[in-house]
Amino acid sequence: MNFLHQYYQDIIKKKLENLNDKIQCSFEFFPPKNLDTEKKLFSSVVKLSLLKPFLFSVTYGANSGERKKTYSIVQRIHKKTGITTAPHLTCVDASLSELKEIAKFYWENGIRSIVALRGDVPNKSYQHKIYALDLVVLLKKIADFDISVAAYPEIHPESKNAQSDILNLKKKADAGANRAITQFFFNVESYLRFRDNCIKNNINIEIIPGILPIYNFEQLKKFSSMTNVSIPKWMFEMFNGLDEDLETQKIIGSNIVINIVKTLLYEGVKNFHFYTLNKSDVIYSICHMFGL
C-alpha cells in the first residue's frame, strides 16, 4: 500500500488538520463457524482494536443457537479488548415478549449498546409482524440502551421508494435511535443525497456510512444483488479479466475504498463503519493511512 500512501499523504494531512473532532471508526464481525475461523476472527479483532474504534458489532442469526453464539462472541470480544461491543438484535422469528427477555438479559449482563434491525426474511413466504421501529421502542422502554439502526442510501430492497425509507428512519430516530449505519455503497453521491434528505426531514442523528472492503468482485456482485446496491459500470471495467487474480482485485478494491473514504472526509464525514468480513489487513491499512 506504500504507493497509495505516498499519493494521498499530503491531501489527507491537510484535511485532518481541518477537523475539529477526532475521526472515529467502528467494525462489524460475524460469529465464526468453527475453531479455525474463530482464530481468524480474534486475530482481526486484536489487530483492529489497535485503531481504538468507538464500537465493535457482531451480527445475529434468527435461531436461538445463533443468538447464544452472538452473545458469547460479544462478551469475549469486550473482555479481550475493553471496547464497547454491540450485538445485533433482529425481529425475525421472535415475539415481542421474547425480544423483551433477550434485551433484559443483555442489560443485566452489562451490554449497553445494540444494533436494532428488522432482519432478513428466512423465505419468500415469511410475513413480518415486528419491525425495527417496534424493537427500538421496546428497547428504550426496558433501559437506556445506545441503539444503532440501519439506513439505505440506495433504497431498501422491499421499500416502495426512497421517501418511504426516509420516513421509516425518522420514526426510528424519533423513537430513540442514537445513530444510523448505512448499507454499503460505491456511488458516494447516493450517500450524500441521502444525508441531505435526512437533514431536510429533520432526522437529527448521525448517518454513518457503511464501508465494505473489496476482496473478490464475484463475491461483491452477489452481496450487491442481495442488498439492492448498484455497482458502477466503471467498476466492472476495472475488474474485467481478473477473475483468477484475487491479489490484483484486492489492490484495486483497496484503491476504490480509499477514494470513497477520501471523498467522504472532504464532505465532512468523521465516523465510518466497516463491514470487515472478519478480515483486518486491508481495513487496517486504509484506516491507518487516514489517521484513524
Swiss-Prot record:
(6S)-5-methyl-5,6,7,8-tetrahydrofolate binds at D120, Q183, Q219, K279. Its EC number is 1.5.1.54. It is an enzyme of class 1 (oxidoreductase). NADH binds at T59, Q183. It catalyses: (6S)-5-methyl-5,6,7,8-tetrahydrofolate + NAD(+) = (6R)-5,10-methylene-5,6,7,8-tetrahydrofolate + NADH + H(+). Keywords: Amino-acid biosynthesis, FAD, Flavoprotein, Methionine biosynthesis, NAD, Oxidoreductase. NCBIfam families: fadh2, PRK09432.1. Belongs to the methylenetetrahydrofolate reductase family. This is 5,10-methylenetetrahydrofolate reductase.
